[in-house]
Amino acid sequence: MQPALASFKDKIGQPIGTSPWFLIDQARIDLFAKATEDPDPMHVDPAWCAAKSPFKATIAFGFLTMSMLTHFSHQALGWLDNLGADEGGYGLNYGFDRLRLVEPVPVNGRIRAHFTLLEWTEVRPGEVRCKYGVSVEIEGKTRPALVAEWLGMWITGEGHRRIETKHGA
């Protein structure tokens, strides 16, 4: 196993990065609505929200907030992209053990993500599964937008060859 990847295990239980603030404006919310074919007025109709929503303004889709996690991870943890790079290594999204949408993100709200390494497990040679604690903060709010336990796989050398063989590449 590549030494940098093995040494990452020493960070279990520690904060490992925070992304910069990111603006969630109406244009981004509208693009997400279009991409997901979801015209819910709670997200895309400011007039409807002013009259009928308890928030009195549009809010971001919870799935929009969730979908930003990959971007936030690259912003906060860019140094991770080099783990295993000398062996052709790369990371894969492995899903979630837990995810909660705690507080809605208001239109024109700014959010950022905080990451903690919770677990590091060598599944087999060339495959390391990491569990990250993630909290998405909303600027000026006490409750987070999202809390999650996010799983990722780091693939190097032998793991890559196994995946390549399995998928007939």
Task: Identify the residue ranges that each predicted region occupies.
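A beta-strand/beta-hairpin structural motif
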Residues: Y94-R98
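HotDog/MaoC-like acyl-thioester-processing domains
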Residues: M1-K11, L101-A169
